[in-house]
């Protein structure tokens, strides 16, 4: 049995990547956002970011939500990272090189971060990492192999997201991560695993300062859950200076960071729940970056001389889960009909202002192994009606579509979809769910139809397809199950032969697309809206920014 299939869902509690805080009036936000303490207001040395939400937790084993992404990236480092290359569509930006490189170990163009060097055994069952010496945490403790071992042991013991990361890497037990020397650590698996290197580039596989964590957690909290939730304990470029949830987080650059002190001394990460307020603050020069804006707002900012706006293809996907355990979506022809009825191009133009592309596959189209050749659901109401007739639903049916009130695009998409379905006799009730409770609606899997937005952070076809379509995956919210797909995913996980993996990924995509577990919506672009004098932005597949990249 493949290690991919070992992660049994209940432990995994993955937050919706685009879940945002509930909106408040712009007038209430403005005084607060502009009240930046004078200690942080040094010209040119402070970066102010307007974001939908502050970090809910600093423990990446339990939280995947807006605001947490940037915090984790600032406070922690992993063993490896992808090499950076110029972005073809954004001349002033870079992006991670996630292409397959047959001449490199694991087929990946990587650079060392906490690891100085690394070796992948030809068997694909063992990876050895030599750590940089003299790397200090924000608490003054030196990085050792014990920190890496403790970090992964924590993942084993606490489960949650750790249950997924250990399983997807093929690790069966804590002893599979071994301290070979003070600065050498190895990862050992029973079957060849193609993610033994790639997994260490993931934003949510950082290394903790185990000395500090053990001291703070003590015997009552051996894995330092309470401490890590509210404090930094890492080897990253910044340390946490202040965290006031619902208001702001403040980060201070570390002069002793092994990669050199970042150009920006202080980062003030302000919570501004409404996108209109974030736009206003950027236009007025009160903030340097405005995150997660509506398409029309993005268009308007392109005419502001003091602002630079760039949109690039991203790993984001938005779709509608069609619950295969709730009639009539247990019928494959009904699911196919729902896709033929979806006016994809109208949505892209009317809602996204062309800042998105059609979702024509079941994994990010920028990832190796993606195939768009199996999408055949161009808008065709006659075809949709024909399939409903075939399914015995020719007279139509009633259903419910739940959407996130905190996501500015889901409601207009739902209204357009509702109108199209009405033409073939499908009455769709729209259920507006508050942002704070939306994720629970997704994970309960009780909704016949529900929006979902996500991005598989590891740019690998096996990782992506397993996450959403393995019948045992906790993130398979459509309850999709196909024995042949499970078999193909298991076979992908058990070989390091990239040609074999890509061939099986293609087979799996063909089956999945034909059986339509989702209504395929869009690939939204990633947008960076910032002051024109702010340089250095890099696009990451985790769809977050890294403070250390920026300079003026």
Label every model-predicted segment:
Residues 21-34, 51, 65-71, 244-247, ...:
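Detector for C-terminal structural segments
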Residues 1-12, 16, 20-27, 37:
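N-terminal secretory signal peptides
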Residues 50-122, 153, 233-235:
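N-terminal lobe/hinge region of extracytoplasmic solute-binding protein
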Residues 114-161, 180, 186, 278-281, ...:
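Aromatic- and charge-enriched surface segment that lines or borders ligand/interaction sites
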Residues 81-86, 94-105, 109, 201-262, ...:
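Gly/Pro-rich hinge or "lid" segments in bacterial periplasmic/extracellular proteins
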Residues 132, 226, 254-300, 418-419, ...:
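Ligand-site clamp/hinge motif
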Residues 48, 144-153, 182-188, 192, ...:
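Alpha-helical secondary-structure segments
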Residues 130, 165-217:
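Surface-exposed binding/hinge segments that line
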């Amino acid at each position: 049995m493949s290690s991919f299939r070992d992660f049994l869902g209940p432990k995994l509690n993955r937050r919706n990547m685009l879940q945002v805080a509930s909106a408040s009036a712009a007038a209430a936000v403005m005084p607060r956002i502009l009240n930046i303490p004078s200690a942080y207001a040094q010209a040119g040395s402070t970066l102010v970011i307007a974001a939908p939400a502050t970090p809910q937790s600093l423990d990446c084993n339990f939280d995947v939500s807006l605001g947490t992404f940037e915090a984790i990236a600032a406070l922690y480092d992993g063993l490896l990272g992808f090499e950076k290359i110029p972005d073809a569509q954004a001349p002033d930006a870079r992006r991670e090189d996630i292409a397959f490189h047959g001449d490199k170990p694991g087929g990946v163009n990587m650079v060392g971060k906490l690891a100085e060097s690394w070796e992948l055994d030809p068997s694909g069952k063992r990876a050895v990492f030599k750590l940089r010496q003299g790397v200090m945490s924000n608490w003054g403790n030196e990085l050792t192999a014990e920190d890496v071992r403790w970090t992964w042991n924590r993942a084993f013991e606490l489960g949650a997201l750790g249950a997924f990361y250990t399983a997807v890497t093929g690790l069966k037990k804590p002893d599979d991560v071994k301290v070979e020397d003070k600065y050498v650590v190895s990862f050992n698996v029973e079957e060849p695993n193609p993610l033994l290197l790639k997994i260490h580039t993931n934003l949510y596989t950082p290394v903790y300062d185990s000395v500090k964590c053990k001291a703070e957690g003590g015997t009552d909290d051996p894995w330092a859950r309470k401490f890590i939730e509210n404090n930094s304990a890492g080897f990253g470029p910044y340390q946490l200076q202040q965290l006031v949830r619902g208001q702001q987080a403040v980060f201070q650059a570390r002069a002793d960071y092994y990669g050199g002190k970042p150009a920006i001394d202080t980062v003030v990460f302000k919570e501004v729940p409404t996108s209109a307020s974030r736009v206003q603050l950027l236009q007025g020069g009160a903030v340097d970056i405005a995150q997660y804006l509506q398409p029309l707002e993005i268009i308007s900012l392109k005419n502001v001389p003091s602002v630079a706006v760039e949109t690039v293809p991203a790993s984001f996907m938005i779709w509608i889960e069609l619950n295969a355990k709730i009639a009539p979506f247990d019928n494959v022809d009904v699911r196919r009909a729902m896709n033929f009825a979806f006016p994809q191009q109208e949505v892209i133009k009317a809602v996204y202002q062309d800042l998105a592309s059609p979702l024509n596959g079941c994994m990010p189209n920028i990832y190796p192994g993606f195939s768009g050749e199996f999408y055949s659901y161009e808008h065709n109401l006659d075809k949709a009606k024909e399939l409903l007739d075939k399914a015995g639903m020719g007279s139509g049916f009633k259903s419910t579509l739940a959407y996130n009130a905190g996501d500015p695009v889901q409601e207009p998409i739902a209204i357009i979809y509702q109108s199209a379905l009405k033409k073939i006799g499908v009455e769709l009730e729209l259920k507006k769910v508050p942002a704070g409770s939306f994720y629970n609606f997704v994970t309960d899997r009780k909704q016949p139809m529900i929006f979902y937005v996500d991005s598989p952070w590891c740019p690998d076809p096996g990782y992506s397809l397993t996450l959403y379509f393995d019948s045992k995956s906790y993130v398979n919210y459509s309850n999709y199950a196909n024995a042949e797909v499970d078999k193909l995913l298991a076979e992908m996980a058990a070989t390091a032969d990239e040609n074999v993996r890509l061939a099986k990924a293609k087979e799996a995509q063909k089956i999945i697309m034909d059986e339509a577990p989702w209504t395929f919506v869009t690939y939204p672009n990633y947008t960076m809206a910032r002051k024109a004098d702010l340089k250095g932005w890099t696009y990451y597949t985790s769809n977050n920014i890294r403070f250390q990249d920026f300079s003026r």
